[in-house]
From Swiss-Prot:
This is Serine hydroxymethyltransferase. Its EC number is 2.1.2.1. Gene3D superfamilies: Aspartate Aminotransferase, domain 1, Type I PLP-dependent aspartate aminotransferase-like (Major domain). One of its GO terms (molecular function) is glycine hydroxymethyltransferase activity. It comes from Rhodospirillum centenum (strain ATCC 51521 / SW). Pathway: One-carbon metabolism; tetrahydrofolate interconversion; Amino-acid biosynthesis; glycine biosynthesis; glycine from L-serine: step 1/1. Belongs to the SHMT family. Homodimer. (6S)-5,6,7,8-tetrahydrofolate binds at residues 127, 131-133, 252.
Length: 429
């Protein structure tokens, strides 16, 4: 590397160094600015979180934990990780936090590694009922390495069948029971899960990845008083960078989780991501975050009400969280078709199975909607009522159109863009 090239290495901007990638990122920024994000697992982070994640901490290796690293030069990344840990403990009122997992899936894997042996039995919610891949789906490592007993929801109201959980726990005596899911919109009775676990001597693990921000703000029940261990992502309703975390009130179990994360599953932690987690946790400790989380729930309920008024079914009859799971069968539409037409109209969501869904997993009878991202950009109940009406307009157009919904999509897309421009994001980027 000559001197001129070396000096440019530290000064060239992305637009000059890699224009193709720069343009892709600019296009993604425009997409986020001009579309309404309704994917329940997505959110929009603050400028401060972006800055921390794009900082020089990306250069630093820091295997181990604060004060016990396998590398030198960790004085300042130790500060970042300690801030993240202490803020997480304050946020959730717990005694232990590990902020190193790269994802929620790896946080779950770490708990399995700490508490189970290959071939052990655990219980989790069936993916088809609203669970998660890592809760024992056959295609996932959790379903390959362990014996999985799945529980579901009742046919009549689509709520967790606690009697089934209890009966299966007594029959199969799992070593671990998982509560939580990725498409379950209602409150979960964590105390009842703990009673079931205690009766058979099992650990209770709660995966609150979807609900963490709501839990932190006190608008959704906390699992921490009941669970032996809680895992979560740090994005979704918590509004931080994409990553994972493990929480507990048992420091002795915490030692096992630490060893499972490192050296069990991971090597060097991503210190720039951990710094961004610290920023997000600090933001969530502020009073305005509670108002945000309450708005997330209020907005989701308004959205659900407007969709019902428009002739759609809502799984479980409503929501206690940010998730609105929509059954499209009243309009004779599939989730695959609905996802595509809504995206063409400027609203992104994901196709999702509904309980006892007759369609294939890549087709589905439903879509999953969420309120966190649009609430972050400033949408209130009036805007979510409008969004609900726009969704119905697009879906009704598709139901009438024999597959060509272009006219409705174009008309609604202009309304979506106008609505988004009233609530701009990242004006300085």
């Amino acid at each position: 590397m000559d001197m001129q090239t070396g000096s440019r290495f530290f000064t060239d901007r992305l637009a000059d160094s890699d224009p193709d990638l720069f343009q892709a990122i600019r296009s993604e920024l425009t997409r986020q600015q001009d579309q309404i994000e309704l994917i329940a697992s997505e959110n929009i982070v603050s400028q401060a979180v972006l800055e921390a994640q794009g900082s020089v901490l990306t250069n630093k290796y820091a295997e181990g934990y604060a004060g016990r690293r396998y590398y030198g030069g960790c004085e300042y990344v130790d500060i970042a990780e300690t801030l993240a840990i202490e803020r997480a403990k304050a946020l959730f009122g717990c005694a232990y936090a590990n902020v190193q997992p790269h994802s929620g899936a790896q946080a779950n894997q770490a708990v399995f590694m700490a508490l189970l042996q290959p071939g052990d039995t655990f219980m989790g919610m069936d993916l088809a009922a609203g669970g998660h891949l890592t809760h024992g789906a056959p295609a996932n490592q959790s379903g390959k390495w362990f014996k999985v007993v799945s529980y579901g929801v009742r046919r009549d109201d689509h709520l967790i069948d606690y009697e089934e959980v209890e009966a299966k726990a007594r029959e199969h005596r799992p070593k671990l029971i998982i509560a939580g899911g990725s498409a379950y919109p209602r409150q979960i009775d964590f105390a009842r899960f703990r009673r079931i676990a205690d009766e058979i001597g099992a650990y209770l693990m709660v995966d609150m990845a979807h609900y963490a921000g709501l839990v932190a703000a006190g608008v959704y029940p906390s699992p921490l008083p009941h669970a032996h261990v809680v895992t979560t992502t740090t994005h979704k309703t918590l509004r931080g960078p994409r990553g994972g975390m493990i929480l507990s009130n048992d420091p002795e179990l915490g030692k096992k989780f630490n060893s499972a994360v490192f050296p069990g599953l991971q090597g060097g932690p991503l210190m720039h991501v951990i710094a961004a987690k610290a920023v997000a946790f600090g933001e969530a400790l502020r009073p305005e975050f509670k108002a945000y989380a309450q708005a997330v729930v209020d907005n989701a309920r308004v959205l659900a009400d407007r969709l019902v008024a428009g002739g759609l079914d809502i799984v479980s009859g409503g929501t206690d969280s940010h998730i609105v799971l929509v059954d499209l069968r009243p309009k004779r539409l599939t989730g695959k078709a609905a996802e595509a037409t809504l995206e063409h109209a400027g609203m992104t969501c994901n196709k999702n199975g509904v309980p006892f869904d007759p369609e294939k997993p890549l087709v589905t009878s439903g879509v999953r909607l969420g309120s966190p991202a649009a609430t972050t950009r400033g949408f209130g109940t009036a805007e979510f009522a409008q969004v609900g009406d726009l969704i119905v307009e697009v879906l009704d157009g598709l139901a009438r159109s024999n597959g060509d919904n272009t006219a409705t999509e174009t008309r609604v897309r202009e309304q979506v863009r106008a609505l988004c421009h009233r609530f701009p994001i990242y004006p300085a980027l």
